[in-house]
């Protein structure tokens, strides 16, 4: 069995790490490189960086900090933000990233997933899915351009359909960003994760809602996710990564302990 992964998420805007609640009202957390090094030193299995306004601004992720991160950490990291061509991806990978993640650009042009997978291999290609539960309809819908509140829009895709579509096109991993839960720290949406897990044959990463160590355990035990991504509990030092992994191992979760 592959070890489960603990993945701190660093949302980047204007060269700094920020964090919002339900993808809104972002506050500045700190500088990118020192935070990345701290999480690597604490025992994170990998890191994810989202340049949250790149797609809505019509630009690619700022690559200047990617190489600086690569110089100070020795764990895999994934970069996302406005990547919409093979050249964009090649540049980011050449600066030291191990994976690239696409979200809004994949919705705009689903063939991008296949072209990237064919060029760089599926192991490098992550698709991020920003999913919102609409209580009125009882359905999960995919959202686009979520880094900019004024441009966020609901797409035609229901989440389960898009999960299956991106796999057909070559996604090597899926990060499910559950917008309703984002930043509120009351637990991952286990019902949604379980529904996605049932149709997802590639590694699935849960994102949105972690507030306690038990929430991580529930995601691994009850929804069978491969990794758990979190931000605010790490940024605000509510949970220490090393202590979290010790706790999970004691609960029988297969995990790399520092």
Swiss-Prot record:
Entry GO MF terms: imidazoleglycerol-phosphate synthase activity; lyase activity
UniProt cross-references to InterPro entries, sorted A to Z: Aldolase_TIM, His_biosynth, HisF, IGPS_HisA/HisF, RibuloseP-bd_barrel
EC number: 4.3.2.10
Keyword Cytoplasm: yes
Subcellular localization: Cytoplasm
Reaction catalysed by this enzyme: 5-[(5-phospho-1-deoxy-D-ribulos-1-ylimino)methylamino]-1-(5-phospho-beta-D-ribosyl)imidazole-4-carboxamide + L-glutamine = D-erythro-1-(imidazol-4-yl)glycerol 3-phosphate + 5-amino-1-(5-phospho-beta-D-ribosyl)imidazole-4-carboxamide + L-glutamate + H(+)
Membrane-spanning intervals of the chain: none
Organism domain of life: Bacteria
Presence of keyword Lyase: yes
Pfam families linked to this entry: His_biosynth
GO cellular component term, pick one: cytoplasm
BP term (GO), one: L-histidine biosynthetic process
Keyword tags: Amino-acid biosynthesis, Cytoplasm, Histidine biosynthesis, Lyase
Pathway involvement of the protein, from the record: Amino-acid biosynthesis; L-histidine biosynthesis; L-histidine from 5-phospho-alpha-D-ribose 1-diphosphate: step 5/9
Active site residues per record: 11, 130
Homology family: Belongs to the HisA/HisF family.
PANTHER family in the record: IMIDAZOLE GLYCEROL PHOSPHATE SYNTHASE HISHF (PTHR21235:SF2), IMIDAZOLE GLYCEROL PHOSPHATE SYNTHASE SUBUNIT HISF/H IGP SYNTHASE SUBUNIT HISF/H (PTHR21235)
NCBIfam families, per the entry: hisF
Role: IGPS catalyzes the conversion of PRFAR and glutamine to IGP, AICAR and glutamate. The HisF subunit catalyzes the cyclization activity that produces IGP and AICAR from PRFAR using the ammonia provided by the HisH subunit.
Subunit record text: Heterodimer of HisH and HisF.
Protein's name in the database: Imidazole glycerol phosphate synthase subunit HisF
